[in-house]
Amino acid sequence: MNASTKLLAPLVAALALAACNAGGSSIVPSAPAQSASLRLHAAAPRWMAQGLAKPACPMVTGVPTCLALIESRGGISPDVAGWAPIDFQTRYNLPSSTNGAGQIVAIVDAYDNPNVTDDLSTYRTQFGLGTANFTKYNQDGKTSNYPRGSTSWGVEIDLDVQMVSAACPLCTIYLVEANSSNNPDLEAAELTAVKLGAHIVSNSWICYSSNSCVKKADFQKPGVVYTAGSGDMGYNFNGNPESLDSVVSVGGTELRKSGSTYSESVWNGAGGGCSNNGSGAGVPKPSWQKDPDCAYRTDADIAAVADGVAEYDSYGGGGWFTVGGTSVATPLIAAVFALAGNASSQDAGKRFWSLKGRKRNHDLHYISSGNDGSCGGSYLCQAGTKQFHTYSGPGGWGTPNGIKAF
């Protein structure tokens, strides 16, 4: 961690106490600098304020950290607790049993989870997904000499490979483990993922409050779709790599089921909003974004479930437990790109911003309720405003309804 790195400062002592009582980090965010036109939120996201989860990795700004949130620990059955592959496949109308063979999805994470292969096998056996086509690499592209282990990043690693499996069981999955969570190592792993042949690279990590943490050149290779989580700290707590206009920024939703009917609302922790997140100048606005309330790159682009998902982790997680965060949604969206099979012809989030109304309304689920903070009623934090078509910052243009939007 470099000298400029700082822990997220406390909002109020009560929120810090709530996080501690939940077994989570006592580090909670301070509000970003006041916007000239919109009032930013001054509260921690609900998962933190109410002690509903704790971060798997330390919550810091300026350097990469993983986005997995631990919601429950061990001793539960995935049959009764946690969303499972059938829920994702049904809600998102995915052709998971027929599509995806030959498609390579790479996961880039830091450090090693030595149990990831066995954990993935347990997950896939539990849910009838068959044998995985899975390979683990180090950041140099070798299948040996892995980095040292980390139980924190181990939670993220298991989550990522299991979510790709959940949506695309026939996909080939490459896990590329960076030597550390330092920027140069993760960037090296990104390059290795592409050299290995992946056309889809999933990143469930973020540099909060930084638009210069990683080099855009490492996330802008022709014919490659990069997905990255928009963050778990709510409105305007975004950062690299998801705020790059060459990356698909993935927000989050809460999934509900009544009988056989699913519905979604914005997950309150989802990052999103305007990329001038209180740390200085934002990412320049790409020409394909025309929304009115942000003069910089607006995120997220798309979303998926980010709460209450079943995971199996024998390395540091004690078996089955439930997890959340945009680290759930990010590999799910990567897998949907693989199911569609068009990754090599995509242009990051531009695809979703360019959809016409009828196609958008048919091929994506409109997220019409929920927020990730307070922003004066703007679509940047509030779903369902229709101020800019069906878009909202935390929910993007919606969640998948089949693969035609991808």
Q: Each predicted region: which residue ranges?
A:
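Walker A/P-loop NTP-binding active-site region of P-loop NTPases
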Residues: 336
